């Protein structure tokens, strides 16, 4: 399609664009193949730009710009500003505050200018950068069709068309995708587009609300398929073909929340080897809405607005280029903010040992998740008892599994969202407690029946309270039973964390209900165990007690509770993975089979599982009845160590939660438990707020260093990784996961309106677990709430890009960067910083070369 030349008057421009909706079943000739291919390519390109958003019950952090990381950060910032009015870099107002407060120093600004060749080429100086902070506005956004149509003389007498369309599309999606909340489910046979079309044709009030009395008649002729709707709407616009994809991406950004949900459905489908049409359907719906409104308006103001739209989009390439140039100063300030943190980080790491300490007798090895909340506890534990060696590893512990709780049909992934499960874990009931407990099929069947009965009864009660015919009578009969709930709300308990996976299971079975990994053979189990132990660095020198410590949170009345659990376990706690792995490695046949893989597990080595409650910093052990006497004695001794270490961490965290760090141990724990069980508490913990670095190195590089709970820590010993395969795994899995986490926090803070979920107090859950509305409408909200980032007086998080530090040879790191395009994109396009531990100092990777840090940074 060639560029449409604009005529002098609007009427002529409007006449050039076909405006009649093709009737269904018409014999008109279709578009030529080339035009259709171009349209399909533009739609596909726009859809690829949308990152997925996981449901609430599997909430994991995602970089909302994931579909754009093949471009430099500043170019993405320009596109998001011009196409969606979205802020990518920290606001200039916040940077000005950091400058005035001294958080960003002149040295930081000079360092940022030195790092950015484009800034030097553009003649930017420190004075010019400071002057730019006085101008706070984003580059102007290009309008969409509905924007120019909405800006008519009668706009104050009716509902805003853009808001009305967003609301209608959002409510339609909420009804269509809901499978948990409504008792009466919609008809989905015709897909999302067909459902929307049918819903709109039966909504006789929306035309009056929008001031479009002719809307109903126009709707009768809507194209029957989403493909026809896309072609019709694009043809209606008459825009030049080179800007189609940009315009379509801008259209999707108006319903970015639902687009992200549809992208998640597409992500899941791709993992299963199939396609999902929902994102294309949503694009067709949003495109068609603009064309419908245009059809209903045919006056001078509409024609002038349409001509203005075409004129502005003719200039889209230059608008994007101008925005990219204007945002250069924002990139400088982003680097300056990061330079201050990086200087402090380098200085602290310089105090750690460059060489491993002299080996001593290790009583306990404890593998923790790499999560930033594990760092303070690991440091405290090593300080309290030097005979403990802590290890950092991804919290799913290398198990590519999905878990099915006993007596349920639920199946949930327990691994990073980047991966698909290839193995299964389910619960088993043992005949009795103790080291020699064997499976008891009869007890398992009885437990399943009892659980199904209890869960079924609970579902019936819930259902009775929702039906219109029973709602009032239910309150009369059962209302008094809610007095206990009301009391617990008014006076939150100080109970320890409850285990949701045991809901409905009779108490007599709980102690003997254990998750077990299913595998075809002992050899399959042994091969998996060998890979995990080698990746953890535990293929040799095993301690008598090896502990796998997953983590989970404890909150009440929190729609985003899963976001505080383990991201590596797909928004679940790490309990299932830790227990499954420990039980697997304690199986005698598996230990014997490990010999063939070159791993000898000493007879006195026992594996155990535990969970770190990140809200209260308590440690809970599992399957302790399976421990032999010697291992149980070590565990019992470890309890006093854990108590002291946990108390130290709680005192570190107390000021950020408004608590007194000098309070007695028991009082502080009680206060944290009460916060965790308080349904009105919007900030039970800070999650991963403050995250800024990822260290892939032996523990001695960070041991004893106070990293303030801001660093992900993954153990890695390059001397044992002869072929670089472990490093490759770490840079293509955990590094991507930490990048996703880092950018979700970054985006939610830089633009909380578009990329955050707003105010927790106004959240309403959509579809049971899909997401939330802020209030009762608008787009689906994605990202983090304001309360996850701000304490009411100040921001807890700083929007810094992740600094990744690796202790490995230059060539090994470069080999991974060169082999994997996604890693190359993240590094070269400025989505993260890549550093390494050099022989004498820290080195930064830039423009394909390793360069020592400036003299302003400390050496290691």
UniProtKB/Swiss-Prot annotation:
Cofactor(s) the protein requires to work: Zn(2+)
GO molecular function terms listed in the Swiss-Prot or TrEMBL record: zinc ion binding
Cellular localization per UniProt: Cell inner membrane
InterPro entries: DabA (IPR018752)
Pfam families reported for this sequence: DabA
Annotated stretches, region: Disordered: 1-32
Record's function text: Part of an energy-coupled inorganic carbon pump.
SUBUNIT field: Forms a complex with DabB.
This protein's name: Probable inorganic carbon transporter subunit DabA
Species this protein is from: Ralstonia pickettii (strain 12J)
Biological classification of the source: Bacteria, Pseudomonadati, Pseudomonadota, Betaproteobacteria, Burkholderiales
């Amino acid at each position: 399609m060639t560029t449409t030349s604009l005529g002098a008057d609007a009427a002529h421009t409007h006449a050039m664009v076909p405006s009649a909706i093709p009737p269904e079943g018409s014999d008109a000739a279709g578009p030529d193949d080339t035009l259709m291919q171009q349209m399909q390519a533009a739609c596909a390109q726009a859809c690829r730009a949308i990152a997925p958003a996981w449901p609430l019950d599997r909430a994991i952090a995602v970089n909302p710009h994931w579909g754009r990381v093949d471009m430099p950060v500043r170019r993405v910032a320009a596109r998001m500003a011009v196409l969606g009015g979205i802020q990518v870099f920290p606001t200039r107002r916040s940077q000005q505050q950091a400058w005035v407060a001294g958080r960003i120093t002149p040295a930081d600004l000079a360092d940022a200018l030195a790092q950015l060749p484009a800034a030097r080429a553009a003649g930017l100086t420190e004075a010019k950068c400071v002057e730019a902070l006085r101008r706070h506005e984003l580059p102007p956004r290009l309008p969409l069709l509905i924007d120019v149509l909405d800006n008519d003389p009668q706009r104050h007498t009716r509902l805003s068309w853009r808001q009305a369309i967003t609301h209608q599309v959002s409510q339609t999606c909420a009804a269509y995708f809901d499978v948990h909340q409504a008792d009466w489910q919609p008809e989905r046979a015709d897909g999302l587009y067909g459902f929307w079309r049918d819903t709109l044709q039966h909504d006789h009030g929306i035309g009056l609300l929008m001031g479009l009395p002719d809307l109903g008649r126009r709707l009768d002729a809507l194209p029957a398929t989403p493909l026809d709707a896309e072609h019709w709407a694009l043809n209606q616009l008459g825009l030049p073909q080179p800007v189609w994809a940009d315009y379509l991406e801008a259209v999707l950004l108006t319903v970015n929340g639902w687009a992200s949900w549809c992208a998640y459905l597409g992500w899941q489908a791709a993992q299963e080897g199939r396609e999902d049409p929902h994102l294309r359907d949503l694009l067709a719906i949003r495109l068609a809405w603009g064309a419908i409104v245009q059809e209903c308006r045919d006056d001078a103001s509409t024609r002038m607005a349409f001509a203005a739209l075409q004129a502005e989009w003719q200039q889209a390439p230059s608008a994007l280029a101008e925005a990219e140039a204007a945002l250069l100063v924002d990139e400088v300030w982003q680097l300056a903010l990061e330079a201050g943190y990086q200087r402090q980080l380098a200085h602290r790491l310089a105090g750690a040992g460059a060489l491993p300490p002299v080996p001593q007798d290790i009583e306990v090895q404890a593998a923790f998740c790499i999560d930033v909340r594990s760092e303070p506890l690991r440091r405290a534990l090593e300080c309290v008892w030097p005979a403990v060696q802590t290890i950092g590893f991804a919290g799913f512990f290398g198990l590519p599994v999905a878990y099915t709780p006993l007596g349920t049909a639920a199946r949930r992934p327990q691994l990073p969202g980047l991966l698909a499960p290839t193995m299964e874990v389910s619960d088993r009931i043992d005949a009795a407690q103790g080291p020699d407990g064997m499976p008891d099929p009869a007890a398992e069947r009885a437990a399943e029946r009892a659980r199904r009965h209890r869960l079924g009864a609970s579902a019936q009660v819930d259902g009775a309270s929702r039906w219109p015919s029973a709602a009032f009578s239910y309150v009369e009969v059962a209302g008094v039973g809610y007095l206990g709930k009301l009391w617990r709300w008014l006076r939150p308990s100080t109970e320890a964390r409850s285990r949701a996976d045991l809901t409905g299971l009779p108490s007599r079975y709980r102690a003997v209900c254990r998750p077990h990994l299913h595998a075809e053979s002992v050899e399959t189990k042994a091969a998996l165990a060998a890979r995990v132990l080698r990746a953890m660095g535990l293929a040799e020198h095993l301690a008598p007690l090896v502990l796998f410590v997953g983590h989970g949170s404890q909150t009440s009345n929190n729609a985003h509770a899963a976001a505080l659990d383990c991201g590596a376990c797909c928004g679940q706690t790490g309990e299932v993975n830790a227990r499954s792995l420990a039980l697997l490695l304690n199986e005698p046949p598996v230990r014997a089979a490990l010999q063939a893989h070159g791993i000898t597990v000493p007879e006195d080595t026992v594996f155990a599982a535990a969970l770190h409650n990140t809200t209260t910093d308590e440690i809970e052990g599992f399957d302790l009845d399976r421990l032999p006497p010697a291992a149980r004695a070590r565990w019992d001794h470890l309890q006093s160590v854990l108590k002291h270490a946990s108390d130290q961490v709680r005192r570190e965290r107390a000021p950020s939660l408004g608590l007194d760090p000098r309070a007695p141990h028991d009082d502080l724990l009680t206060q944290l438990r009460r916060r965790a069980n308080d349904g009105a508490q919007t900030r039970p913990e800070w999650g991963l707020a403050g995250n800024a670095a990822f260290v892939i190195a032996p523990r001695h590089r960070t041991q004893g260093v106070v990293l303030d709970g801001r660093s992900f820590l993954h153990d890695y010993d390059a001397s044992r990784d002869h072929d670089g395969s472990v490093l490759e795994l770490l840079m293509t899995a955990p590094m991507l996961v930490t990048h996703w986490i880092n950018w979700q926090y970054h985006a939610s803070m830089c633009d909380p309106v578009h990329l955050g979920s707003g105010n927790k107090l106004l959240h309403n859950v959509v579809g049971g677990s899909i997401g939330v509305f802020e209030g009762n409408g608008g787009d689906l909200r994605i990202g983090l709430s304001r309360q996850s980032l701000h304490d009411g007086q100040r921001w807890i998080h700083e929007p810094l890009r992740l600094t990744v530090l690796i202790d490995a040879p230059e060539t090994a790191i470069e080999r991974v960067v060169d082999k994997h395009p996604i890693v190359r994109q993240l590094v070269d396009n400025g989505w993260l910083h890549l550093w390494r531990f050099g022989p004498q100092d820290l080195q930064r990777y830039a423009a394909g070369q390793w360069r020592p840090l400036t003299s302003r940074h400390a050496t290691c």
